[in-house]
Amino acid sequence: MKKTSPATKSESPSKLIDARIKELGDWRGKTLGHVRTLIKQADPDVVETWKWRGVPVWEHDGILCTGETYKAIVKLTFAKGAALDDPSKLFNASLDGNVRRAIDIHEDDTLNETAFKKLIHAAVALNKSKAR
C-alpha cells in the first residue's frame, strides 16, 4: 500500500501541518503539536507556511522557525537564532553557524515553555526591526 503524503497544493499550510502531526502518530507528532501551540500562544499573529517539500514554518515579518521531524528528534531551527539572546540555553544544535540556531528535542526531553515563548517573542521583535 502506497503511503500518502499530506502535501497537496490545494490545502492550507495549517491543514498540512495538522496532517503531518496526525501522520506522525507518535511522540514526534505530539511534540510538534505542543510546540505549535506554544508558538501561537507567544505570537497570535504568526503565519503558518509549508515549505521545502513538507516542512512546517512559522513566520512573522520573515521566518521565525521551522519544525523538522526526524527519526530521533524534532528540530526547531530559528532562522536568525544566532542574533537572539538565549539565557536559558535552549539552543543545543547548529551552534557553529553564523545565522541559524536550533533546538533538538528528543523523546524524553521537556521544553522550558516560558523560555521558548521568550525566544519566539525575541525572534518576532528581531524580524520586525529588520522589516522597517
Label every PLM stretch briefly.
Residues 1-132:
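Charge-dense, helix-prone N-terminal extensions
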